[in-house]
């Protein structure tokens, strides 16, 4: 098992992200900028443009590499021969094959995750370009890129040490981004809280890895002590079967790993950091944190549990411990209830969406429960439901927090009261926010409806009927606080009728998110087949 030169194309998007981050940081540092406001605005604009163009290029390369999405035709003697040849070469040396060094998978699952993170980073960049970045914009965008790189590696990791390093790369970048606005009262506090809770979760996750490593080493010693890489997910899965799956050391390690990642995806009771951080961080960072970061945590948790602990899967029963699906069922139950009920009294829009995000984490756990089924078809459906929900949720939340970023920039407040009479001040923004909020609520025919429908079906097929029933009830409860947005924007009188414009780049990001939410709602099969193809690989 060694790294070959032919493996380089398989990690080309990650290499491009690394080079792009260094380029953005270097160009900002090496260019002499004036100290005036105009010079700083130009500095932020150039850094944002370079980041957006670079991320767009990386997205295109990742899209072309994903040969299961489409096949690049052979050159036919035309003006596009150079591009077609390049595309064919990218696909030939792209995804597929066994994991690199056994630790980095380049399967369809990785391809879709990679595109999701890069797309989210691109939209976040557009939102940030429409926001006021007052200092060191090169650092801001470089950290955003490095965080995206960490997330991409997280989703591809099939080895514990690589997963941990990727998690830290992503997290350390986000800690700094959360506290980016040092002149703000809330931003440094948000960064500090996120750092403290994130450091604790990383320590818990690492301790779980050490316990799991000890289990594998112990079992391997019993089997004769053959040389192995005990931190590979596949090696853990090979030993965690039969009676060994009930080993206290393995179960304890699994519990610590779930708890460590539980902080990253903000499930109850590991959610306490989320409302304060979401409210205090710069709005574009909150948008990225609530979407791409959560998606990366879920995808790592999914690959880890289904690859390293398939022998301890159990069944999603609330009344007894029966494997990791029992743990996830309990977490899903309390997360759905606490997240939605805690959102009811909130008056700050970002804090309200933070608790909403916690509730959505509970819905997402329902899709993972279907892994308890012995049927590959059921497992494929559950995996596809998880991926579909993450994509739709990311688009919807990015757009929603994008609207709040515009409001904060224009009005200086992100309270619900600041949204009163919004339709009289910015009709297009009001219409887009209405669509996005209705999608979060799961109203048909928007994409959020299908996302919830698929995860509820996954939970039902897994046999977690009581849990699905409670989730449906909490969905109805969530309508109350989602409709508060609509009441404020459309019904309550505006404190002052002063029209304002949405920055063009931020407007483009919000429009793109909204259009995709509507399109995926009207045509859910547009990406469902592709997602199912990727899910079938992950469900084997």
Curated annotation (Swiss-Prot):
HAMAP family: NDH1_NuoN_1. Keywords: Cell membrane, Membrane, NAD, Quinone, Translocase, Transmembrane, Transmembrane helix, Transport, Ubiquinone. GO terms for biological process: ATP synthesis coupled electron transport. It is an enzyme of class 7 (translocase). The gene is nuoN1. This is NADH-quinone oxidoreductase subunit N 1. NDH-1 shuttles electrons from NADH, via FMN and iron-sulfur (Fe-S) centers, to quinones in the respiratory chain. The immediate electron acceptor for the enzyme in this species is believed to be ubiquinone. Couples the redox reaction to proton translocation (for every two electrons transferred, four hydrogen ions are translocated across the cytoplasmic membrane), and thus conserves the redox energy in a proton gradient. NDH-1 is composed of 14 different subunits. Subunits NuoA, H, J, K, L, M, N constitute the membrane sector of the complex. NCBIfam families: NDH_I_N. It is a multi-pass membrane protein. GO terms for molecular function: NADH dehydrogenase (ubiquinone) activity; NADH:ubiquinone reductase (non-electrogenic) activity; quinone binding. It comes from Roseiflexus castenholzii (strain DSM 13941 / HLO8). The chain crosses the membrane at residues 11-31, 52-72, 109-129, 142-162, 195-215, 250-270, 284-306, 324-344, 352-372, 386-406, 431-451, 464-486, 508-528. GO terms for cellular component: plasma membrane.
